[in-house]
From Swiss-Prot:
The lineage of its organism: Bacteria, Pseudomonadati, Spirochaetota, Spirochaetia, Spirochaetales. PROSITE patterns: ABC_TRANSPORTER_2, LOLD. Residues 6-226 form the ABC transporter domain. One of its GO terms (cellular component) is plasma membrane. It comes from Treponema pallidum (strain Nichols). GO terms for molecular function: ATP binding; ATP hydrolysis activity. This is Lipoprotein-releasing system ATP-binding protein LolD. Gene3D superfamilies: P-loop containing nucleotide triphosphate hydrolases (3.40.50.300).
Amino acid sequence: MNDPILSVEQVSKSFCCATERIQILSDVSFSVPRAVKVAITGESGCGKSTLLNIIGGMEHADSGIVRVLSCDVLTLHEHALTEYRRQFLGLVFQFHHLLRDFTALENVMLPGLIAGKSYREVRARAYELLEKVRVVQRAHHFPAQMSGGERQRTAVARALINDPTLILADEPTGNLDPKNALIVQDLLFSLTEEYQKTLLIVTHDPRIASMTDYRYQLQQGSLIRI
């Protein structure tokens, strides 16, 4: 492996359930090098999304260390976490989370404008990405006017708008029919390769996992290389 872009060290997480605490993650450690695709698999409810959310600064861990390049994620306060996500991460979820009153183009542009980039630069980049994900013809359509596959491809374009270091994808094809799932998966993989991005994907689909460079399985709180 080359130098890691992501390093997770002894991360643990538990939740309170009625009268007991449920241990979801137990001393999870792994590292991810640059420009590779990594899959995390496991049964529903085993903690895959929790781990991804901790890496993304969207959930707290009970203990451990998460580093993305020089950024010590678990020590960051809220404002710094927002900057961390803006600077380092592209996020793709099972649900597209597009703003319904914004067009596809506006949805893709929004993170770039929030980051303070020029309107002209962001607009040109957004059109380029919509072309890449093959929905440029829907640039001025609202989410309700688009198919599920088109919405999710737009979400992939949005994740790339700020040229992120690391893309976190949580079951990005989980809500799609097989045909659209294959299209979204192929685009996500091809674009991360083209732009030399690191992809960490949570999936229950063994076919998708088999196409990544490194594969891990989460079992009873422990992460196992497979």
